[in-house]
């Protein structure tokens, strides 16, 4: 046998690693980089949640992969209390945050049905939907989105639908904040026998509505809602989420995941129970994000970028005046010391935009405003 390198899957550069050059530019500013590129919360979780991590007395035993009864009860109670969802015959199981679930679900689904080899996902979306397909050896097929950043179901090729393991939808959407018609999407999937996986991690941050929408409002058959505490409760470091919906799908995936050892640590489950049972901290966080989105919109509008407030989510999706997202990202790095994500990270059709995450502490946004005020003063003096 030869000693050559065997050709195979080579992971692409991680999107945010490609920002190192721009980060170096922002680091030169007094006060350093103001990072608006990643949606990692900066505000603290409720103190009761943090306390539960150290008082659960649950460190020694192996936790249930599906989640403890208290964990699942708290998650179901949150869905009912907060969104009026009658879970009915829906099943529910824990996941270790949602990113690992998004990345691994296609692999597990294909093991069950090797005749299907396609994952459908929004053309502008979280990169892990496509990566999950690639890691499973599947075709990653983007679905066109309309001017409101919502899926154009009529654009899906019938041959792709016939080969689809699943259709991913994300509402409120990342990066553009679109709000999907989940009733139509659920029906599309049922009519074609395609499971619909709805990533709803921003559901609490639906703007202009009393409550967010879940695909579970339209029944559990053939659908799955995926949720996380990362954004809702500022618990991205805890890695706690759940998937709920079609009992057959939940049963299959939870059994496979149990064999794979996918478990939310028991102390994290205890903390999650506390978080799911409290809504006051979420209401306070909603007010914080609303203010930040408006402040950042005003800042980025000075670049002649088209910046609308999102229907939901934590991001501004700003259109570059010259159609070059990288150029706009470089400009804000050089002039404001801020790091934003070029839109191409979320699909080729996003290349004319940047994504701005409203998660930086208020003091860092103060700093951006001070820098821009100083820059305007310099411009006037010149």
Predicted feature residues:
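N-terminal small-domain helix-loop-helix segment of the aminotransferase-like
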Residues: 2-100, 275-276, 378-382
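Helix C-cap/helix->beta junction micro-motif
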Residues: 29, 136, 191-192, 303, ...
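PLP-dependent aminotransferase-like
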Residues: 107-169
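A short helix->loop->beta-strand "cap" motif at the edges of active sites that frequently abuts
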Residues: 117, 191-195, 221
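Active-site phosphate-binding strand-loop segment of PLP-dependent enzymes
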Residues: 147-208
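Conserved core segment of the aminotransferase class I/II
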Residues: 221-290, 375-377
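Conserved glycine-rich beta-strand-loop-beta hairpin in the small C-terminal domain of fold type I
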Residues: 269, 273, 289-297, 307-319, ...
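PLP-dependent enzyme catalytic core of the Aspartate aminotransferase-like
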Residues: 331-340, 346-382
